């Protein structure tokens, strides 16, 4: 066997032949110096090495394994280049996304054909929801009968509900729902009427002062009093009143004395609302 520069093949052959070398000889072969390699003398087993032969073999095998691993393992640059590119990752993700899309298409096909049991159970639920959301249109005859029953009793009973269901050809649920909505509407109308009445001046204190006439306003008594019985009262559709009506908040002694005989129709009860067109009323808004 010819001596040649250090290589992995030579080390593998030497390890198979169970050659024993010292640390200095291994360093010389690793450096690749041919002059040093020519002066190497292999120790014989007869003379006996100073160190056990097993240690040399383990060290030699360890060096051979490291060299082989370095040659087999690619460099760091090659590892970076070997990593998948972003485009390859995108294609793999798209391939994974194709599978759920196919499953969705098969599910839609099953829904159309109605092969699965779950779809069969889901269809009646959707139909019930659509039927519940649909608004019932009542005919004028039905509304008239419902309004008549509502005027008699705002809270319908079971017997009346069954009667209306037979007469109007409606379900009891529809009649019950109509009465609930009608009660809410009645409640809103009542509240709105109270608010309008309050701000229209029916409940606002209103007093007039005949001693301080305004320009263009004829002086008339603002206090509701009854004329003496000696004066003739005009013909009225209602009977004569026998009591004296006094505005609230005023004591009878606090009413100023006025010559009622100078006013025409002084025997009539003059209400503040009768003079509404002649004077600008106070409006809170």
Curated annotation (Swiss-Prot):
InterPro entries for this protein: HD, HD_metazoa, Homeobox_CS, Homeobox_TF, Homeodomain-like_sf
Gene3D superfamilies: Homeodomain-like
Protein name per Swiss-Prot or TrEMBL: Homeobox protein vex1
Organs and tissues of expression: Widely expressed in the embryo prior to gastrulation. Becomes restricted to the ventral marginal zone by mid/late gastrulation. Ventral localization persists during gastrulation and neurulation in the ventral region of the closed blastopore and in the proctodeum during tail bud stages.
PANTHER family according to UniProt: HOMEO BOX HB9 LIKE A-RELATED, HOMEOBOX DOMAIN-CONTAINING PROTEIN
Gene: vex1
Membrane spanning stretches: none
DNA-binding region positions on the chain: 131-190
Protein localization: Nucleus
Function summary: Transcriptional repressor. Acts in a ventral signaling pathway downstream of bmp4 to antagonize the Spemann organizer and ventrally pattern the embryonic mesoderm. Represses transcription of the dorsal genes gsc and otx2.
Chain positions covered by the region annotation Disordered: 30-54, 69-88
GO biological process: BMP signaling pathway; cell differentiation; determination of ventral identity; negative regulation of DNA-templated transcription; negative regulation of transcription by RNA polymerase II; regulation of transcription by RNA polymerase II
Domain of life: Eukaryota
Record-linked SUPFAM superfamilies: Homeodomain-like
CDD domains the record matches: homeodomain (cd00086)
UniProt keyword list: Developmental protein, DNA-binding, Homeobox, Nucleus, Transcription, Transcription regulation
Gene source species: Xenopus laevis (African clawed frog)
GO MF annotation, one: RNA polymerase II cis-regulatory region sequence-specific DNA binding
Listed Basic and acidic residues bias regions: 69-80
GO CC annotation: nucleus
Disulfide pattern: none
């Amino acid at each position: 066997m010819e001596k040649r520069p250090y290589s992995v093949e030579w080390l593998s052959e030497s390890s198979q032949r169970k050659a024993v070398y010292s640390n200095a000889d291994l360093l010389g072969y690793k450096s690749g110096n041919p002059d040093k390699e020519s002066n190497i003398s292999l120790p014989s087993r007869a003379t006996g090495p100073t160190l056990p032969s097993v240690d040399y073999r383990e060290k030699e095998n360890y060096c051979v394994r490291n060299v082989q691993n370095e040659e087999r393992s690619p460099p760091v640059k090659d590892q970076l280049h070997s990593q998948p590119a972003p485009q390859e990752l995108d294609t793999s993700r798209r391939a994974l996304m194709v599978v759920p899309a196919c499953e969705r298409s098969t599910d839609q096909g099953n829904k159309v054909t109605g092969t699965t049991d779950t779809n069969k159970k889901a269809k009646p639920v959707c139909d019930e929801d659509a039927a519940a959301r649909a608004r019932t249109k009542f005919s004028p005859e039905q509304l008239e009968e419902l309004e008549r029953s509502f005027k008699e009793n705002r809270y319908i009973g079971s017997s009346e509900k069954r009667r209306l269901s037979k007469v109007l050809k409606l379900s009891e649920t529809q009649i019950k729902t109509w009465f609930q909505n009608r009660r809410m509407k009645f409640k809103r109308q009542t509240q709105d009427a109270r608010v309008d009445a309050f701000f229209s001046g029916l409940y606002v204190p209103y007093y007039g002062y005949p001693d301080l006439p305004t320009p263009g306003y004829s002086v008339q008594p603002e206090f509701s009093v009854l004329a003496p019985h000696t004066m003739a009262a005009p013909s009225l559709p209602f009977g004569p009143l026998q009591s004296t009506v006094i505005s609230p908040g005023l004591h009878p002694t606090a009413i100023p004395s006025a010559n009622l005989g100078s006013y025409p129709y002084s025997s009539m009860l003059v209400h503040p609302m009768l003079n509404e067109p002649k004077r600008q009323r106070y409006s809170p808004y």
